[in-house]
């Protein structure tokens, strides 16, 4: 008999930072690989990742992911020291790094991690250049969203009256 395929989700997304779009105005998108250890890959496969408060930091002309929490499994080996909050190096092209460094140093942008996902067998991090929003910016975005919903309702009702 043939084995049945297990039902797996088609999504390659590991973790999302849902508050990033709310707290920052995001401009340029970047994708980078991550330098990970074996226990981290096992934990990521089991879904023990949190990137809600993490960001990318430039140090010595290299990019590092700070604040991401990858919790070790209970069955992790005892001879390896598992630090869930360690800084993880991002693997980027020199041209991308130069562009990022210029924007961060000159223009005052921040680097915000928005998603972690699988691409083939590698873990990738999606991050954006962005600036923090003030409270009035957040309020105006909420008003714009509500107006778009109301406008859709009005147009729907207007079309039904015909």
Curated annotation (Swiss-Prot):
**Does the keyword Kinase feature in the UniProt annotation?**
no
Q: By its UniProt entry, which Pfam families does this protein fall under?
A: SmpB (PF01668)
GO: which molecular function terms? Answer: RNA binding
- Residue ranges of coiled coil: none
From the UniProt record, give one GO term of the biological process aspect. Answer: trans-translation
| NCBIfam families per UniProt | PRK05422.1, smpB
The record's function comment reads: Required for rescue of stalled ribosomes mediated by trans-translation. Binds to transfer-messenger RNA (tmRNA), required for stable association of tmRNA with ribosomes. tmRNA and SmpB together mimic tRNA shape, replacing the anticodon stem-loop with SmpB. tmRNA is encoded by the ssrA gene; the 2 termini fold to resemble tRNA(Ala) and it encodes a 'tag peptide', a short internal open reading frame. During trans-translation Ala-aminoacylated tmRNA acts like a tRNA, entering the A-site of stalled ribosomes, displacing the stalled mRNA.
Name listed for the protein in its UniProt record: SsrA-binding protein
Source organism per UniProt: Colwellia psychrerythraea (strain 34H / ATCC BAA-681) (Vibrio psychroerythus)
The gene name reads: smpB
């Amino acid at each position: 008999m043939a084995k049945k395929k297990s039902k797996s989700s088609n999504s390659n997304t590991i973790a999302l930072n849902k508050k990033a779009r709310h707290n920052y105005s995001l401009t340029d998108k970047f994708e980078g690989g991550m330098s990970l250890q074996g226990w981290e890959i096992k934990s990521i496969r089991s879904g023990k990742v949190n990137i809600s408060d993490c960001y990318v930091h430039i140090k010595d002309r290299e990019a590092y992911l700070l604040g991401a929490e990858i919790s070790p499994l209970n069955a992790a080996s005892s001879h390896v020291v598992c630090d869930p909050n360690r800084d993880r190096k991002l693997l980027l092209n020199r041209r991308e790094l130069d562009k990022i460094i210029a924007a961060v140093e000159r223009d005052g942008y921040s680097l915000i991690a928005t998603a972690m996902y699988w691409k083939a067998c590698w873990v990738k991090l999606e991050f954006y250049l962005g600036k923090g929003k003030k409270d009035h910016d957040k309020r105006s975005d909420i008003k714009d969203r509500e107006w778009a919903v109301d406008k859709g309702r009005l147009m729907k009702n207007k079309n039904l009256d015909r």
